[in-house]
Amino acid sequence: MWLYLVALVGLWTLLRFFRVRQVVSHLQDKYVFITGCDSGFGTLLARQLDRRGMRVLAACLTEKGAEELRNKTSDRLETVILDVTKTESIVTATQWVKEHVGNRGLWGLVNNAGISTPSGPNEWMKKQDFAHVLDVNLLGMIEVTLSMLPLVRKARGRVVNVSSVMGRVSLFGGGYCISKYGVEAFSDSLRRELSYFGVKVAIIEPGFFLTGVTSSARLCSNTQMLWDQTSSEIREIYGEKYLASYLKRLNKLDKRCNKDLSGVTDCMEHALTACHPRTRYSAGWDAKLFYLPLSYLPTFLVDALLYWTSLKPEKAL
C-alpha cells in the first residue's frame, strides 16, 4: 500500500517538474506591455524579457525613467509615458500598443504600477488619502486592463497582475491593503471570464522586497505627514511614544526586505512564458512560509497574533 502511494507521489512530482518547465514557442515574436517600468520590478522585468528576446513595450511614468531603461536594453525595447490614473494617457498608450502589435495582438499585459503611501492607522487619514492609492493600484489597473483586453484576447495571451501578501492579510490601514484585496478579486473574476477565450490570468503576491514601495525613508515621511495632519484628539489618543515606535519599526524595514528582486520577476516571467502558468505566485520565503499560511488560519487566531505583536496606542484599554 505504502509503496503504491510513494510511487504515485513520485510520478506526480515528476510530471509536475516537466509540466512547469514547458515553454511557449516563438517567444521572440511576442509582445509584452508592462506598466510601472521606471524602477523596481517593472524595470527589472523589462530588462529580463528583453534579454530573452521578447518584444517589450515598457510604460514609464517619467521620461527620465524611460530614458534610463532604454540605455540598459536593446533596440527591440520600446517605451511610452503612461499615467494609469489618467484616462487620456491610457487611451494614448493603448493606441500606441495597437500600432506596434498589429494583427498579432498583445501576448502579455503586466499590471505592475503601484504605490504604497499614504498608509498607516486608518483614522489618521482622510478619504482622499485612500482614493490616491486606489486610483493607482486598483482603478488604474482595471482601466488599463479593460483598454488592452481586446489586444490580449486576439493573441490568446496572458494578464499578469501584481498584488501582494497584503492582498491576503491586511496588516495596516490605508488604501494599500484594500487595493491589493481588490486586485485579487478583480483577477479572480477576470480569470474565470477570459478562460473561455484562451486567455490566462496570473496573480503575483510578493512578500517584502526592497523597492520604492517599501522604502523606509518614504514610509517614515508619509507617517510623519499623516501625524501632522490629524487632529489633536487623535494625537492624544495614540501618543508621541506610539509615533516614535512606529517610525522606529519603519526605519528597520529596509533591512528586513529582500534585495534580490529576481524572486518576483522570475515569477512574472514564468507566468508569461510557461505553457502552464500558475494562478498565483507567492514570491519570497516570507510570503511562502509566513504570510500565506497565516492567511489560511481562522480569523480569530490572526487577530490575536496581530494584537499581541502590534504597537498599542497610549490610551488603549
UniProtKB/Swiss-Prot annotation:
Q: Could you say which residues bind NAD(+) here? A: 33-57
Its top-level enzyme class, in one word, is oxidoreductase
Provide the alphabetized UniProt keywords. Answer: Endoplasmic reticulum, Lipid metabolism, Membrane, Microsome, NAD, Oxidoreductase, Steroid metabolism, Transmembrane, Transmembrane helix
What is the membrane topology listed in the Swiss-Prot or TrEMBL record?
Answer: Single-pass membrane protein
Substrates-to-products reaction catalysed: all-trans-retinol--[retinol-binding protein] + NAD(+) = all-trans-retinal--[retinol-binding protein] + NADH + H(+); 9-cis-retinol + NAD(+) = 9-cis-retinal + NADH + H(+); 11-cis-retinol + NAD(+) = 11-cis-retinal + NADH + H(+); 13-cis-retinol + NAD(+) = 13-cis-retinal + NADH + H(+)
* Any one GO molecular-function label of the UniProt entry: all-trans-retinol dehydrogenase (NAD+) activity
Q: Which InterPro entries match?
A: NAD(P)-bd_dom_sf, Sc_DH/Rdtase_CS, SDR_fam
| CDD domains reported for this sequence | type2_17beta_HSD-like_SDR_c
Highest taxon above the source species: Eukaryota
Which compartment or compartments is the protein found in? Endoplasmic reticulum membrane; Microsome membrane
Give the pathway listed in the UniProt entry for this protein.
Answer: Cofactor metabolism; retinol metabolism
The EC number of this protein is 1.1.1.105, 1.1.1.209, 1.1.1.315, 1.1.1.53
List the GO cellular component terms: endoplasmic reticulum lumen; endoplasmic reticulum membrane; organelle membrane
Q: Name one GO biological process term.
A: 9-cis-retinoic acid biosynthetic process
Q: Which residues form the active site?
A: Y176
After translation, the protein is modified as follows: Not glycosylated.
Assembly behavior:
Homodimer.
Description of its domains:
The C-terminal region plays a crucial role in controlling the activity of RDH16 and its required for endoplasmic reticulum (ER) retention.
Q: So what family is this one in?
A: Belongs to the short-chain dehydrogenases/reductases (SDR) family.
By what name is this protein known?
Answer: Retinol dehydrogenase 16
What's the source species for this entry?
Answer: Mus musculus
In the UniProt record, the gene name given for this protein reads: Rdh16
